[in-house]
Swiss-Prot record:
Record-given protein name: Ribonuclease PH
Function: Phosphorolytic 3'-5' exoribonuclease that plays an important role in tRNA 3'-end maturation. Removes nucleotide residues following the 3'-CCA terminus of tRNAs; can also add nucleotides to the ends of RNA molecules by using nucleoside diphosphates as substrates, but this may not be physiologically important. Probably plays a role in initiation of 16S rRNA degradation (leading to ribosome degradation) during starvation.
Presence of keyword Transferase: yes
Protein EC: 2.7.7.56
Length: 242
């Protein structure tokens, strides 16, 4: 029997998205990213220094952190204090890699940008929402530096966005929620640039296997969703006054 989406979306339809920019008064760039019932607070902090391996290089750096609040899921999760889980480390490395791909570090100069992504509510897709929202926080931070004259030209090369896709009952679906994520035989996280080049493809079969044709279908579906997200990102950045 064909899979019926719990929220009645079409297979190629994103969940409702909303970007509340300037969410934090203390950060140079911030956004509360809504993706369906998933909520991720993304903030950008700029520090006037770089890691030791970049000292006197004239180049900047970007790093990212990811955390999930204890109350973000139906059952409370313990805070990660002294040691991060393997999952958390993997996700924040993914976010950092994805956002570094969009920066010209020579234009940024010797500054470090820290992107903090905190999951307030999780209904699947937290890492992809963190990347998509993280780019908005980054874009707002760069916009501010340009406005105040700390940068003469933007170090942003291309926007970056991410989305999940999966196979359920052998059929491809875009932007899985939690119920769909747990039912999927195959699920992928796909990260792309504004010119639709791939930055990262994370995917696995939870049961069985999948064909090259199905892989191509999933990537095409991800591209469709990412094109929509890229437009929404740019609208959020352009319409924000700091």
């Amino acid at each position: 029997m064909p899979w019926t989406r719990p929220d009645s979306r079409q297979p190629d339809q994103l969940r409702p998205i909303l970007f509340e920019t300037n969410y934090s008064r203390f950060r140079v760039g911030s956004v509360l990213a809504h993706c369906g019932e998933t909520r991720v607070l993304c903030t950008a902090t700029i520090q006037p220094n770089v890691p030791k391996f970049l000292l006197n290089s004239g180049k900047g750096w970007l790093t990212a952190e990811y955390r999930m609040l204890p109350g973000a899921t139906p059952e409370r999760q313990s805070r990660e204090l002294m040691q991060l889980s393997g999952r958390t480390q993997e996700i924040q490395r993914l976010i950092g890699r994805s956002l570094r791909a969009c920066l010209d570090f020579e234009r940024l100069g010797e500054r470090t940008i820290i992107i903090d992504t905190d999951v307030l509510q999780a209904d699947a897709g937290t890492r992809t929402t963190a990347i998509t929202g993280g780019y908005i926080a980054l874009g707002l931070a760069i916009k501010k530096l340009l406005e105040v004259g700390e940068l003469q030209e933007s170090p942003l090369k291309l926007p970056v966005a991410a989305v999940s896709v999966g196979l359920i009952e052998g059929e491809p679906f875009l932007d899985l929620n939690y119920a769909e994520d747990t039912a999927a035989e195959v699920d992928f996280n796909v990260v792309m640039t504004g010119n639709l080049d791939l930055i990262e493809v994370q995917g696995t079969a939870e049961s069985g296997s999948f064909s090259r044709l199905q892989l191509n279908q999933l990537l095409d579906l991800a591209q469709t969703g990412i094109q929509e997200l890229l437009v929404a990102q740019q609208n959020a950045i352009n319409s924000t006054y700091q």
